[in-house]
C-alpha cells in the first residue's frame, strides 16, 4: 500500500482523548489537528498547547498537519492581515516542536459585501501570501494551500498564485471533494487534480455524489464517488507516497458550523469512512 493514512479526527470526537481513541480504533497513529474541544489548535494558549502536545507524545500520535485558518472561508481578503500574521508566528514554533511541516491555508475569498475587482483581489492575495511565505521559509514550514475558498479555488487561479508568489513554501493540498461539492460535478475535481498534479504535496480525502433528489451534490463514502479511485490510481502511478488525510464532512462540517455532536454517530461514520478508504486503496 503506497499511501499513509491520517485524518481530521475532530469530525469523530470533540475531545483530544476521543480523537486519539478513534485513530487507534482504525489502527492509525497520525492526526491532522484542527478543533480540540471546539477550539482551533492554532488558537490554543501556550499552556493548552503544551498539554495537547504532551498527550499526543504520550499516546505515540504523530502530528501531520495543522488545520489553520489563514485566508479561509471566514477570513476574506478584507480581513485585518495582522490576524494571519499573528497566527503563523504563534503556530510555527509549535509545528517545529511537533516535527510537523504542513500548515493548511486558503487564499482569501473576495469580500461578499464589498467585493474587490478581480485584479485588486489578486494583488492583495499575492501581497499577503508573499509576506506569509517569507515567514514560512524562515520557520521551515509549508503553507499548504487547499483547493477550497479563495483566489486559488480553481486551478488557473492557484497556478497564478504560484507564479506570482514564487516561493517553495507555497504548496498544494488537493482535497478530492471540494470542487465536486462547489460545482456539483466530480469532473471539476479531476480537472483541478490533472492540471495541478505536480504541485500536490498533501491530499485531503472528501467525496461527493448527486443528492437523492438529483440536486446539489452531497458528501459520501469513497466507494460511492468514482473520481476517488481515479485520483488514487494516478497518484500511485506518478509516485505519490504521502498522506491521505480524511475529512469526510458527512456528520460534521466545521465551515458550516456543523460540529460533531455527542450521539456517537460522527465517530461511527468516521471509522467506516477510514475502513472503506483502506479497502479501496488496497485493491489499487
Q: What are these regions, as identified by a protein language model?
A:
Residues 8-10, 34-36, 68-69:
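Acidic/polar N-terminal loop/beta-strand segments that form early-domain functional surfaces
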Residues 13-21, 58, 74-172, 181, ...:
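Active-site acidic/histidine proton-transfer and metal-coordination neighborhood
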Residues 1-9, 13-29, 53, 85, ...:
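Histidine-acidic metal/acid-base catalytic patches
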Residues 48-58, 125-135, 195, 230-234:
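Catalytic-core regions built around general acid/base machinery
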Residues 37-39, 70-74, 109-111, 151, ...:
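Feature marks short, surface-exposed loop/turn motifs that line or immediately flank catalytic pockets
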Residues 1-6, 64-75, 107-112:
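N-terminal small/glycine-rich loop or linker at the start of catalytic domains
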Residues 32-57, 108-113, 117:
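Glycine-rich, proline-tolerant flexible connector loops at the mouths of alpha/beta enzymes
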Residues 32-33, 64-68, 101-108, 143-147, ...:
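Short beta-strand segments at enzyme active-site cores
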